[in-house]
C-alpha cells in the first residue's frame, strides 16, 4: 500500500498503517484484536477508552464532537489540546475482541515510529498507564512495517486493503511473540 501524502508532499506512513487496521476492524464487524488510534481519557483511573456509543468495540470517530458533548459537560475544567489529557496510541491489541479496549482487556499497546519521530518518556509513561504496565508497551519502527512497498500496485483496492491489513496484523503478531507463532 502506498502511504498517504501530506500537504507538503511528505509520506504519511502512520495514516497508512492506521487506515489498513481500521479497514480490517470494520471488515470484522469491529471485532479485530487490533484497534488503531483509540483515544483514551487520561483523567480517568485507569485511563478510559473513548468508544462509539452504539458499538463499544469501535473507537469514537470524531474526537472534537466527543470533547464538546462529554468533556465540557462532565468535567469542571476545559479540555486543553496538547496537554496529555487525551492520548491516542497507534495500536491497542486486545485479549477479547468482543469487549472494549479497557485496561483489563489490553494485551499490548503498540507505538509505531517513522523517521525522526521519538517515543518520549511522558508518552511511554502514559501508554504504560493505559496498558496497565510497561511490559505491555511495545515499540515498532519503520523497518517492521510494510507501508510504502508498492509491489502490488495493480491489485484491486479491496484485496490490497485486506492484504495490507493482514500483513500489518501478521507483523504485529510476529514481533510481539518474538517469532514464536
Model regions and ranges:
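Active-site metal-binding core of divalent-cation-utilizing nuclease and nuclease-like domains
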Residues: 4-105
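Extracellular, luminal, or virion-exposed ectodomains of exported proteins
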Residues: 1-7, 138-140
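Short His-Asn-centered micro-motif
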Residues: 94, 112-115
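Hydrophobic, gly/ala-rich membrane-insertion helices/peptides used by toxins and envelope proteins
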Residues: 5, 10-13, 47, 59-60, ...
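Solvent-exposed, acidic/flexible segments
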Residues: 6, 10, 112-113, 120
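Catalytic cores of nucleic-acid endonucleases
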Residues: 78-89, 99, 106-107, 114-166
Amino acid at each position: 500500500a502506498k502511504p498517504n501524502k501530506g500537504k507538503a508532499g511528505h509520506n504519511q506512513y502512520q495514516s497508512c498503517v492506521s487506515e489498513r487496521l481500521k479497514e480490517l476492524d470494520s471488515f470484522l464487524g469491529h471485532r479485530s484484536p487490533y484497534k488503531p488510534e483509540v483515544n483514551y481519557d487520561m483523567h480517568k483511573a485507569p485511563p478510559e477508552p473513548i468508544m462509539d456509543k452504539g458499538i463499544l468495540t469501535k473507537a469514537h470517530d470524531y474526537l472534537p464532537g466527543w470533547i464538546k458533548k462529554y468533556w465540557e459537560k462532565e468535567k469542571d475544567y476545559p479540555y486543553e489540546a496538547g496537554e496529555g489529557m487525551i492520548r491516542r496510541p497507534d495500536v491497542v491489541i486486545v485479549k477479547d475482541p468482543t469487549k472494549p479496549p479497557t485496561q483489563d482487556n489490553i494485551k499490548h499497546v503498540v507505538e509505531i515510529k517513522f523517521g525522526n519521530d521519538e517515543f518520549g518518556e511522558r508518552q511511554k509513561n502514559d501508554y504504560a498507564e493505559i496498558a496497565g504496565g510497561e511490559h505491555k508497551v511495545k515499540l515498532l519502527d519503520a523497518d517492521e512495517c510494510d507501508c510504502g512497498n508498492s509491489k502490488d500496485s495493480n491489485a484491486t483496492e479491496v484485496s490490497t486493503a485486506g492484504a495490507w491489513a493482514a500483513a500489518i496484523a501478521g507483523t504485529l503478531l510476529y514481533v510481539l511473540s518474538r517469532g514464536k507463532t
